[in-house]
Amino acid sequence: MTEKRYLKWYNKVGYGSGDIAGNVVYAFLSSFVMIYLTNTVGLNPGIVGTLIAVSKLLDGVTDIFFGSLIDKTHSKMGKARPWMLYGYIGCAITLVAIFAIPTNLGQFAQYAWFLIAYTLLNAVFYTANNIAYSALTALITKNSAEQVEMGSWRFMFAFATSLLIQSITLGAVTALGGGAAGWRTVAIIYAIIGLLVNTLSVFSVKELPEGELVDTTNKKEIEQDEKYNLVQAAKLLAGNKYYMMICVTYILQQIYGAMISMGTYYATYILGNQNLFGVFSWAVNIPLIIALVFTPTLVAKWNGMYKLNVMSYTLATISRALVAVAGYMGSGNVTLMLLFTAIAALGQGPWQGDMNAAIAACSEYTWLTKHKRVDGTMYSCTSLGVKLGGGLGTAITGWLLAASHFDSALAVQPESCISMLKIMYLVIPFALDAIITFILSRMKVEEANEKLRAAA
């Protein structure tokens, strides 16, 4: 029996474009906040890393809090769309604030400014926006194939935006005056673009009626499904092993991304050409986009996500090992590094494309086992993963830079720093890919749901 389809092509494209807005924030922040703070503002990378880690203490609570709020929201726009729309206004304001730290402030005030703006962006506004955006996967369609297609469109836009930002930002900062003024102007431009695209994405889709989502029109039954407090929500999530697997995987992916962002330092201080960071960005993002184009077809051909995810990430792990080998062979092996980087990205693509569908399957698992609809709360793993993983990754890079005696005033870094940059950019990404591959080999949520439905 063919599943009912709910979406037109323009709904999928409109939804996917929302990650242009998300990556205007995330790609810009994760790729450039550390080098902006150390080389332009003059802050200590170790202290910055510690402040980011302190900020992350709030994230786990706010993720579950906003996910629960979304589940309990009833409005003309639906459950998630209001949070996606209004949350981004705060994202735009705080993004500009982070890249507009006054240079005439005392250093203590600069650290405080960064901590407040960074915490508001991540723990409040980005949380509300991103959880709502991700939850729409389960709120605008019940068709699993469409959910995979939505994920593919979403991450095609995400990686294209990331590629563009990583490729043009340093040049744009220089063209717009350089220094603090250049960074501030670029942040304002990105924030305006993100605000416009996010608004268009919100109004490109409509949520399904709540009765259709839970297969009942009984309002009391719907309300009963939503009766749980914050502690109960946390227990529902913790009791779903597949949610925990996805959450850990998401966090590891974002730490991986933070390490890859060290390419700005690697290209500058080891390869001797900061513009090579943009070339490596192409080697990462173009293969990811190509993989995403074919992900829905491959999922359908292989009757599910499991085999595709495990096999493709195994390829990614092997390729990252070869990137490390080429990197340690010397700076003359840039071509080999680019080749294996591209193959690794190709292997990572399918999981990026079907991840949201996997989360929807996790939500279905909770419904089948606990009889609670927790779509918004379930998608908290996307926001939690991005913020906790990305923040922790950025904090770790700051600590490691400080521990290796990085000095932004030096054109040539000490050998301790060069060795650490190689570990961060070559070794750690390989290790993270290996761990993710192992977790994906255990993530048999589709099979579990089929058994539960058969037993019902």
Language model segments and positions:
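Membrane-embedded alpha-helical bundles of multi-pass transporters/translocases
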Residues: 2-456
